[in-house]
């Protein structure tokens, strides 16, 4: 009986524990859900605050832009045609001109007004968000004073039209008009008191000053004296505003001093450069420039499409005209560059999101839009864009935007190339991801044709358009080459062992791409020389041609020759290595250390007696003349037929030397090496040879390579230039992780 009770007790405890565990799991799930909701709400709050702050600061930059644009004009010079050409042409232009011309501003008043606009703009741009909202509440209060003034003037006019010298409120109908006007004034007073947050009785009593004509009329004020009551109300309002400003001035001065101290503290803590960067981020200058330019651009589009009645068939020219009319000062030029940067960055991020690549840019200038923004600024400054007329701006801007599109297509190709070439070796990649990447690559094939077609329809053919067309053709050829290499790699992944001819196909595709690049560059050079002969010599054209010859022809030709030499040397060397037969491979039952696929039918034996697939080793040796496992430098003397002998002898030598390497792994440099080894094929002239430092430098490089790790897989993924430009940090991290795992 006691045993049964113990079993029942144990069962109850287990049930209780399960119940508690389920409860704890439920609580943990609820806690995680609440945390995720809090994180989402925080992000939404931050985004809302950013949008609100940027929108509230927008008038400051607009005021400075308009002041800069019309700083050379006087008020009398403003004409009806000039106002109709502005983005505000959908307002009542005659009324605005009549208002401006009747003010009779003199020069001193214009200067005071200009400095006041600058002061207000700086307040919009620099005040904290809480103070900025407070500032808007004051402006809204002034607007409500204007509404109260208008209602008071309407009331006086209505009373003058009635013709009643003496007011008799002997009925509810007669009281109705006066009561509604008085109620409207009280509602405005309540709103003003809420906005100004007045906390004293005298201030509240002074607010309903425009109700004075209503009270005076209801108290029996003669009709001819009613305008005097309205004038008294206006005078009282002005006195109230002046008194309020004097009362709030010490607080404004104190806030200004506090802000200056905070700015000084930022520069003292962070230094000059970092301090400017901190203030730049705090004031959200980039977002503000983008928002300002987009706002002005949309206003211009509204004028062109709605006010001027242009059709949607002219949308291309309308867009270019809108950008040209919007960009008139250095401020809007910077805003245009920042907007271009954001658009290019968003397109690059969207491409990475679609293809499943990482969204980290790696470097601050990599696919972040800064290159396109700097290109816009440099080209506009070089050509004097801001001083041109709208028609000239439109043509030049079309050229600049096509250059930006060409640079953007090149950035997108760099993104899709890495992703598409890594997809065949990724077993977890879904078919949808493969399809998305192929679609992006096909778009890079088609889009350059459309950009070239539209550019030729808008712009004449010159050296700039020739360079853009050549870049478009290069991007198309590269995209086609990447698609072909992707197909070849897919075929290779379906085979049991690496395909012997796959490296040849990849090599021919790369050679074809490089040939097309060189051909396009030479065509541009010939066209540029013809332009110089036909049109005449200019320093800008000569500088462009010189840069084009150095970068696009000489450097590409040098890289192509080096690529072909390295590949031919790798093929020559791999053919001189001995082959392992099927019996040896079955006895070893080993995998290739490069591709990690079992070696069944074909393998090559290095001079240090390591086995690899022939295609894998050829790819490796085309980049680095070292053994992938032990990083022993392989010289020309090592690739001879004498190293091959019978299978048994190879096995014995391989086992003996493998044991020797295991016994003395710390001193691999003690292996015999020819003192006067010839330079590996494909190496360029080295100035160290002139001073006899080559042997010492090679020893140092081999030691560093052994330290950085023997399982460096980068040569299989990137070309020679990319490998040499890459830092060794990635390989060091890989070695550290493998040592920790071992």
Swiss-Prot record:
- What is the membrane topology listed in the Swiss-Prot or TrEMBL record? Multi-pass membrane protein
Database matches in Pfam families: TRC8_N (PF13705), zf-RING_2 (PF13639)
Specify the enzyme's EC class, one word: transferase
Where does this one sit in the cell? Membrane; Golgi apparatus, cis-Golgi network; Golgi apparatus, trans-Golgi network
Catalysed reactions, semicolon-separated: S-ubiquitinyl-[E2 ubiquitin-conjugating enzyme]-L-cysteine + [acceptor protein]-L-lysine = [E2 ubiquitin-conjugating enzyme]-L-cysteine + N(6)-ubiquitinyl-[acceptor protein]-L-lysine
Give the GO terms filed under biological process for this record.
ERAD pathway; proteasome-mediated ubiquitin-dependent protein catabolic process
Recorded name of the encoding gene: rnf-145
Cystine pairs annotated here are none
ZnF RING-type: positions: 592-630
- Where is the segment annotated Disordered? 642-684, 722-742
Record's Gene Ontology CC terms?
cis-Golgi network; endomembrane system; membrane; trans-Golgi network
Compositionally biased, Acidic residues: which spans? 659-672
Q: Name one GO molecular function term.
A: ubiquitin protein ligase activity
Task: Give TM regions.
Answer: 109-129, 138-158, 178-198, 233-253, 285-305, 318-338, 368-388, 395-415, 438-458, 463-483, 533-553
Task performed by this protein: E3 ubiquitin ligase that catalyzes the direct transfer of ubiquitin from E2 ubiquitin-conjugating enzyme to a specific substrate. Acting downstream of probable Golgi transport protein eas-1, involved in inhibition of activation of transcription factor sbp-1, thereby playing a role in regulating AMsh glial cell size.
Q: Could you tell me what this protein is called?
A: RING finger protein 145 homolog
Under which EC number(s) is this enzyme classified? Answer: 2.3.2.27
UniProtKB keywords = Golgi apparatus, Membrane, Metal-binding, Transferase, Transmembrane, Transmembrane helix, Zinc, Zinc-finger
Instruction: Report the SMART domains cross-referenced here.
Output: RING, RINGv
InterPro entries per record: HRD1_E3_ubiq-ligases, TRC8_N_dom, Znf_RING, Znf_RING-CH, Znf_RING/FYVE/PHD
């Amino acid at each position: 009986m006691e045993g049964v009770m113990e079993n029942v007790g144990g069962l109850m405890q287990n049930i209780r524990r399960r119940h508690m565990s389920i409860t704890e799991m439920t609580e943990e799930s609820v806690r995680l859900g609440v945390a995720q909701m809090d994180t989402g709400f925080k992000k939404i709050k931050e985004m809302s605050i950013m949008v609100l702050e940027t929108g509230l600061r927008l008038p400051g930059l607009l005021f400075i832009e308009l002041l800069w644009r019309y700083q050379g004009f006087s008020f009398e010079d403003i004409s009806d045609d000039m106002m109709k050409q502005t983005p505000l042409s959908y307002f009542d232009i005659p009324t605005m001109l009549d208002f401006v011309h009747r003010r009779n501003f003199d020069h001193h008043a214009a200067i005071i007004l200009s400095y006041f606009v600058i002061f207000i703009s700086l307040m919009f741009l620099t005040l904290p968000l809480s103070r900025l909202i407070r500032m808007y509440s004051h402006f809204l209060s002034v607007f409500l004073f204007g509404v109260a003034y208008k209602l008071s003037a309407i009331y006086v006019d209505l009373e003058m039209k009635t013709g009643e010298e003496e007011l008799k409120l002997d009925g509810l109908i007669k009281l109705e008009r006066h009561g509604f006007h008085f109620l409207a004034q009280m509602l405005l007073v309540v709103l003003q008191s809420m906005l100004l947050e007045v906390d004293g009785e005298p201030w509240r009593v002074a607010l309903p000053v425009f109700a004075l004509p209503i009270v005076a009329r209801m108290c029996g004020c003669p009709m001819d004296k009613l305008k005097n009551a309205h004038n008294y109300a206006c005078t009282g309002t002005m006195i109230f505003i002046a008194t309020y400003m004097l009362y709030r001035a010490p607080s404004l001065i104190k806030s200004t001093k506090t802000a200056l101290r905070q700015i000084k503290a930022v520069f003292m803590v962070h230094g000059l450069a970092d301090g400017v960067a901190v203030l730049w981020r705090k004031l959200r200058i980039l977002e503000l420039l983008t928002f300002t330019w987009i706002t002005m651009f949309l206003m211009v589009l509204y004028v062109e499409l709605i006010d001027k009645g242009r059709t949607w068939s002219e949308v291309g020219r309308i867009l270019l005209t809108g950008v040209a009319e919007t960009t008139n000062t250095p401020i809007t030029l910077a805003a245009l560059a920042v907007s271009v940067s954001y658009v290019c960055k968003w397109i690059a991020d969207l491409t990475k999101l679609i293809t499943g690549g990482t969204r980290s840019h790696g470097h601050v200038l990599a696919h972040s839009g800064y290159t396109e923004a700097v290109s816009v600024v440099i080209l506009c400054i070089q050509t004097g864009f801001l001083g041109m007329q709208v028609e000239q701006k439109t043509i030049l801007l079309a050229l600049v935007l096509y250059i930006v599109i060409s640079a953007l297509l090149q950035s997108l190709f760099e993104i899709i190339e890495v992703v598409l070439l890594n997809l065949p070796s990724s077993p977890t990649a879904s078919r949808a991801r493969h399809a998305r990447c192929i679609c992006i690559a096909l778009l890079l094939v088609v889009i350059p044709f459309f950009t070239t077609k539209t550019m030729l329809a808008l712009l004449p053919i010159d050296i700039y358009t020739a360079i853009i067309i050549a870049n478009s053709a290069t991007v198309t050829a590269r995209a086609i080459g990447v698609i072909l290499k992707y197909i070849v790699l897919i075929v290779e992944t379906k085979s049991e062992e690496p395909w012997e001819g796959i490296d040849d196909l990849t090599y021919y595709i790369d050679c074809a791409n490089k040939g097309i690049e060189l051909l396009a560059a030479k065509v541009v050079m010939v066209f540029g020389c013809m332009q110089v002969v036909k049109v005449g010599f200019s320093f800008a054209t000569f500088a462009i041609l010189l840069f084009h010859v150095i970068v696009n022809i000489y450097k590409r030709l040098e890289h192509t020759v080096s690529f072909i030499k390295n590949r031919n040397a790798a093929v020559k060397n791999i053919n001189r290595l001995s082959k392992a037969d099927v019996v040896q491979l079955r006895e070893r039952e080993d995998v290739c250390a490069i591709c990690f696929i079992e070696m069944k039918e074909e393998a090559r034996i290095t001079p240090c007696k390591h086995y690899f697939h022939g295609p894998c080793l050829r790819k490796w040796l085309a980049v680095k003349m070292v053994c992938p496992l032990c990083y022993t430098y392989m010289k020309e003397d090592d690739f001879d037929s004498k190293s091959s002998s019978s299978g048994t002898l190879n096995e014995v030598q391989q086992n003996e030397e493998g044991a020797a390497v295991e016994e003395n792994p710390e001193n691999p440099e003690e292996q015999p090496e020819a003192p006067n080894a010839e330079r590996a094929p494909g190496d360029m002239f080295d100035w160290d040879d002139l001073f006899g430092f080559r042997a010492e430098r090679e020893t140092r490089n081999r030691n560093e390579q052994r330290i950085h790790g023997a399982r460096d897989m980068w040569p299989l993924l990137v070309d020679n230039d990319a490998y040499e430009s890459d830092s060794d940090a990635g390989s060091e991290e890989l070695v550290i992780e493998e040592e920790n795992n071992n």
